[in-house]
Amino acid sequence: MSAQGQALQNHNNELVKCIEDLREKREEIIKQLREDDAEKAKITQELQILTKRLAQVNESIARKTETKNEYDKVISETEAAYLKILESSQTLLTVLKREAVNIAKKKQASS
């Protein structure tokens, strides 16, 4: 019986040791979970800050794009009007030269 008692005692000691090892491993996992949760909270906060900043940058881009488009429109309209002025001044110059020639011819004809 004493051999059986000794075996039972050895099994009991080994069982207690295994349970203690499992508890230590569990505590290590709990520690890692806390660290991961803290990192997750930090990342979540950073993500919220970055998301807000991204929204602000997108709004800025939209406003500046709208302003750029307005500049493009004004420049295009101004260039078109300027081209019309150039064409008109060229036409006016051509008419003026022709009239000057006609006046000179009339003057010579009457002399």
Curated annotation (Swiss-Prot):
**Signal sequence, start to end:** none
Oligomeric and partner information: Self-assembles into fibrils in a head-to-tail fashion.
- State its location(s): Cytoplasm, Cytoskeleton, Flagellum basal body; Cytoplasm, Cytoskeleton, Flagellum axoneme
Protein name, please? Microtubule nucleation factor SSNA1
Alphabetized, the UniProt keywords read: Cell cycle, Cell division, Cell projection, Cilium, Coiled coil, Cytoplasm, Cytoskeleton, Flagellum
**What do the Gene Ontology cellular component annotations say?**
axoneme; ciliary basal body; cytoplasmic microtubule; motile cilium
Gene name of the record: SSNA1
Q: List the disulfide bonds.
A: none
Keyword flag Cell division: yes
Q: What is the lineage of its organism?
A: Eukaryota, Viridiplantae, Chlorophyta, core chlorophytes, Chlorophyceae
User: Which phenotype arises from disrupting this gene?
Assistant: RNAi-mediated knockdown results in multinucleate, multiflagellate cells.
Q: Which sequence ranges form a coiled-coil region, renumbered to this chain? A: 6-71
**Which Gene Ontology terms describe the biological processes this protein takes part in?**
cell division; microtubule cytoskeleton organization
Question: Can you name the source organism?
Answer: Chlamydomonas reinhardtii (Chlamydomonas smithii)
Write out the function statement from the record. Microtubule-binding protein which stabilizes dynamic microtubules by slowing growth and shrinkage at both plus and minus ends and serves as a sensor of microtubule damage. Induces microtubule branching which is mediated by the formation of long SSNA1 fibrils which guide microtubule protofilaments to split apart from the mother microtubule and form daughter microtubules. Required for cell division.
Q: Which family does it belong to?
A: Belongs to the SSNA1 family.
Chief location of this protein within or outside the cell: cytoplasm
Keyword Cell cycle set for record: yes
Q: Which PANTHER family match?
A: MICROTUBULE NUCLEATION FACTOR SSNA1, SJOEGREN SYNDROME NUCLEAR AUTOANTIGEN 1
